[in-house]
Regions:
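Conserved catalytic core of Hanks-type protein kinase domains
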Residues: 47, 88, 117
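Glycine/proline-rich, positively charged
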Residues: 27, 94-122
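Residue-identity detector for glutamine
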Residues: 12, 46, 90, 98-100
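Generic beta-strand or strand-like secondary-structure segments
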Residues: 69-73, 88, 106-113
């Protein structure tokens, strides 16, 4: 898989990015069509094996369960320094309606929560 530098960051990302909006617990969040953990795990594993090392998700995808699945799968199959994770923080989480938007407090809170769900510190 070809890689490219991401902007001016110096990060090298795979030419393809795996969008993870369709991964998560179908009973959480507003998308009942999401793939449950077992099916999501298989797709993430196949993507990593094919050289896709850039994954995109968001805090609100299936109310955080997309990030939880990604974190769990990557914990078992990949070294953290080999994968670039992109997530978002603006969306409204079902269990935290006051922690939305782009205030400093909300951003810092949602970054910490996403890192915890993704099982990483960066």
């Amino acid at each position: 898989m070809k890689t490219h530098r991401l902007g001016r960051s110096g990060l090298q990302v795979s030419e393809l990015c795996l969008g993870c909006m369709s991964f998560g617990d179908p009973l959480r969040g507003g998308h009942p069509w999401t793939l449950p953990k077992e099916e999501s795990r298989d797709l993430i594993r196949q993507a990593i094996e094919a050289g896709i090392t850039f994954l995109d998700t968001a805090n609100v995808y299936s109310d955080g369960s997309s990030e939880e699945i990604i974190g769990e799968v990557l914990w078992h199959i990949a070294r953290r320094d080999e994968v670039v994770l992109a997530t978002k923080v603006q969306g409204v989480m079902l269990n935290e309606p006051q922690m939305q938007g782009l205030s400093r407090r909300s951003i810092l809170h949602n970054i910490d929560a996403s890192l915890k769900r993704l099982r990483t510190d960066h």
